[in-house]
Amino acid sequence: MNDLKRMNIKELEDLCENMREQIIEVVGKNGGHLGPNLGVVELSIALHYVYNSPEDKIVWDVGHQSYVHKILTGRKDKFHTIRKKGGLGPFTDPNESVHDQFISGHAGNSLSAATGLAMANPDKDVIVIIGDAAFANGTTLEALNDINGKIKNLTIIINDNEMSIGENVGAISEVFNKVINSHFYLKLRKDVRKLLSRYHITKPIVKPTERLEQSLRSIVTPGGFFNILGYDYIGPM
């Protein structure tokens, strides 16, 4: 972990490549979840680069996305045993490592667990990684409503990969399906600012332009959904 924090960008990129190769090799032999883990390699490394686990709590909503997390937290030499009798489990498990906050299988309960961890550890950061499919889970929405943007040491990362075992349905799913529209918003904002700059139009309409920008942002990005609930939204990234 300390070695990770001393790496430069090139070394981190090489680490990502090595992680992918290791996961592909082991999953090819043992079975397991290949796509979900390959999709969070950079994210997992970034989290452990920035935060200090286990003091800071990293919570995975879907345990079978935690392969990189396992490798980075002292289980690299045992990774070849994953899903084998007596080997590493396929999900996070606090009995396996202090870096695992709770036993997680499939989707939905991470935000509730993370809320409790954040309240119990107000001087530490708690980070929860949850997918777009899991976000429509009832327990997730209950936790989202309960938090109401008031727990300041909790960061929610939505892995909007449009992947799930079954088809995502419902209004919440539709909100995340609109994320592509945010690229339209970003391009529109850039074009408007370029136009104003070209004609040297600045201060007289700064405030109206800012209000228009805020209105557009609330309409065409999923951030509006979270802003209404009291959260600071950054994205998409």
Where are these regions (language model features)?
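Hydrophobic anchor at the start of a short beta-strand
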Residues: 126, 154, 233
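N-terminal amphipathic, basic-rich helices that act as targeting or association modules
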Residues: 1-73, 225-230, 237
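A short alpha/beta connector and helix-capping loop motif
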Residues: 137-159, 173-182
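Cofactor-binding active-site loop characterized by glycine-rich and histidine/acidic residues
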Residues: 33-150
